[in-house]
Amino acid sequence: MLKKSLAYKNAHIDYFHLISGADFPCKSNDEIDRYFETHKGKSYMWFDSDEETTEWRKRKYPDRYRLYHFHDIGYNNNWIINVFRPIIEKVQHHHIYLRPEIKNVYAGWNWFSWHRSVVEYALCQIELHPKKLERMRYCTCIDEIFFHTMLHDDADWLGIETRNALRYIDWHPTRPAKTLPLVLDERDYTAIKESDAIFCRKVQPGVSERLLRMLEKNTRIL
């Protein structure tokens, strides 16, 4: 995806931002440009804390990559998988791991802002070690594991801030939330603007409508 993107083919583009349809910019284009010009060469990700990593390596991470998850496009065309899938799912219901462990696994948010140097490094690693990417087949939420595991040990010299993704995301809301992360609304505006985030998430039509108008008005003025 990165290698085929028009942005990657344009050598003058220095930064790449992974976002989804539930993200919204909370800084103006000029503010964002100035930020990355000031911090040129730095990249931004969010890695789970050391304490979280130690705890989640016991069950949360292995459940994602040591169990078989049949979400990959085209898997249902494989008759062998279709034959054995009911048996595999029954065994895995008891958290019996059928796949080998990945040593020194790390994880975090899959929303990042990378300098081109990190993009090129990641693509080089995939090209040099294609089996590592192949190992990610039939896993789930693997975009929260693959790059973090790849980049963790080299984060310092790659200039990656590992606890700052430049995203405003509320995983620990002080008000009731139907889902996590919190779906943001106008009550979150001040906290968003006081943060250093360039994107906020999650936003949804209807619920976040007033917040989006406030952010749009603010970024037009700046």
Question: Where is each model-derived feature located?
Answer:
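ER/Golgi luminal nucleotide-sugar-dependent glycosyltransferases, focusing on the catalytic module
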Residues: 1-222
